Curated annotation (Swiss-Prot):
Reaction(s) catalysed (UniProt annotation): diphosphate + H2O = 2 phosphate + H(+)
Disulfide linkage: none
Residues engaged in binding substrate: D17, I18, S19, T54, N55, K189
GN (gene name): LHPP
Cofactor: Mg(2+)
Self-association and partners: Homodimer.
Expression (tissue specificity): Expressed in brain, and at lower levels in liver and kidney. Detected in thyroid (at protein level). Expressed in liver, kidney and moderately in brain.
Cofactor binding: number and manner: Binds 1 Mg(2+) ion per subunit.
Protein name as catalogued: Phospholysine phosphohistidine inorganic pyrophosphate phosphatase
Domain of life, per lineage: Eukaryota
Role this protein plays: Phosphatase that hydrolyzes imidodiphosphate, 3-phosphohistidine and 6-phospholysine. Has broad substrate specificity and can also hydrolyze inorganic diphosphate, but with lower efficiency.
CDD domains (alphabetical): HAD_PPase
Source organism: Homo sapiens
Amino acid sequence: MAPWGKRLAGVRGVLLDISGVLYDSGAGGGTAIAGSVEAVARLKRSRLKVRFCTNESQKSRAELVGQLQRLGFDISEQEVTAPAPAACQILKEQGLRPYLLIHDGVRSEFDQIDTSNPNCVVIADAGESFSYQNMNNAFQVLMELEKPVLISLGKGRYYKETSGLMLDVGPYMKALEYACGIKAEVVGKPSPEFFKSALQAIGVEAHQAVMIGDDIVGDVGGAQRCGMRALQVRTGKFRPSDEHHPEVKADGYVDNLAEAVDLLLQHADK
């Protein structure tokens, strides 16, 4: 077993990233990562509290959960913390009417949101909808506002699908920030508020929790800044250089979720 496994002592709650940890998305619904279905089942049979924490913004929670269930995962919509519902809450509370630069797959999450006469922009992983025209439309909306508001569902650089690495929302968010001279409000990892909402959902304090993800910055770094421990899996978007990142060092590196669960069940809650 890993020599750092004792660092997991006292863990009562586990936050799990989805893409790159449970499965690799892609054509036909993607594929489960070896051992991950049983690993989730073992976690849920234990005394540990489990919450799924994702920046997925190409699918609604309902669609994502249905896809994972078809792959064999024990997961429900109520167990998932995702950025689109959190963004909708912000829009309602602040009376914001967004121009939506998002993927059609997540548009249903915004059905109750007024999008007439936009006074802000919401950007997500829009995939093929990241055309020049759509980016320029978002730019024009922001430039016409006295106090531009840009809300980004996560700020990831890239992620892994079965066909290879794919650009995420972050590069497009940065383009609008640069063009408009503004800073986006990030809803999703690595936002502290996003992690805190996931922890509140399972009633666990940050120092009692561990995040398991494939993103050294968004998952590991974001969780550690909130006071959590964090493990990086060598699946999904993991790159060998992540283990030598100049700013972020995971509490441990594991080959996959199954190995992480082995260590958790040996050392956690002790």
